[in-house]
């Protein structure tokens, strides 16, 4: 797989990965390491620390000091997850937007595989399957809940809504998608800042469905 950059965008990252963070010292290092492990390395990671009162900020700064692709922003007061995501969107410079929450783990080929899908199919969004992992206080896996969508390519909104049951499988999470940044900007798609502690990504994804023309979906769990 070889993805070729347009000369006009050389020097800019292909993908901006946005990570809101709050009091995540226990697991944010694992989330950042999963980004660093990506087989495709033309990315930037923008972390917005929403005034954490634990060691989250220090952990993020330590990673940023070692890798120039990692950028950190810090709020002086807690503003909620939607404001943090919108701020990260404003600072993003990549052709595509991906999300990784502070307790997520990105499979190593998430970016490589889904960049291929979105560009090969001239799509505005790629979406993939995922699983939720339950972990005990001793960091022991105690359960897994997979959410699987079928492979499909949608060429217009009518096709998407006819197959809404499949689309709905992964609609509640922004971190199961790769989004064309120009598409988001053209339609002024951003997060509703009334959501402070969750639910913002479902509304965000529903908003994208009002405008998207081509979308590709993968049954692969990332």
Each PLM stretch: what is its role?
Residues 97:
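Short aromatic/hydrophobic "clamp" motif used to bind/position activated sugar donors
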Residues 75-92, 102-105:
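Glycine-rich, basic loop-to-helix element that forms the pyrophosphate-binding segment
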Residues 32, 57, 61, 81-90, ...:
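Short, conserved alpha-helix that lines the donor NDP-sugar binding/gating region
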Residues 34, 41, 49-58, 77, ...:
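A conserved acidic beta->alpha catalytic loop
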Residues 27-29, 54-63, 105, 109:
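Acidic helix N-cap motif at the loop->helix transition within catalytic regions
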């Amino acid at each position: 797989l070889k993805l070729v950059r347009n000369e006009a965008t050389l020097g800019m990252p292909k993908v901006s990965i946005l990570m809101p963070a709050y009091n995540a010292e226990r697991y944010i290092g694992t989330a950042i390491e999963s980004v660093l492990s990506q087989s495709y390395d033309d990315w930037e990671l923008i972390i917005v620390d929403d005034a954490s009162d634990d060691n989250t900020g220090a952990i993020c700064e330590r990673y940023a000091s070692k890798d120039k692709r990692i950028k950190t922003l810090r709020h002086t007061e807690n503003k909620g997850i939607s404001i943090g995501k919108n701020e990260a969107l404003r600072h993003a410079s990549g052709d595509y937007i991906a999300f990784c929450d502070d307790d997520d783990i990105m499979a190593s080929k998430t970016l490589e595989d889904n960049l291929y899908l979105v560009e090969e199919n001239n799509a505005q969004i790629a979406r993939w399957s995922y699983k939720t992992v339950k972990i005990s206080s001793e960091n022991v896996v105690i359960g897994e809940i997979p959410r699987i969508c079928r492979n499909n390519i949608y060429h217009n909104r009518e096709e998407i809504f006819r197959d809404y049951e499949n689309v709905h499988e992964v609609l509640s999470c922004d971190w199961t998608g790769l989004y064309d940044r120009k598409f988001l900007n053209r339609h002024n798609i951003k997060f509703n800042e009334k959501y402070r502690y969750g639910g913002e990504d479902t509304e965000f994804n529903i908003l994208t469905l009002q405008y998207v023309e081509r979308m590709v979906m993968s049954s692969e769990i990332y």
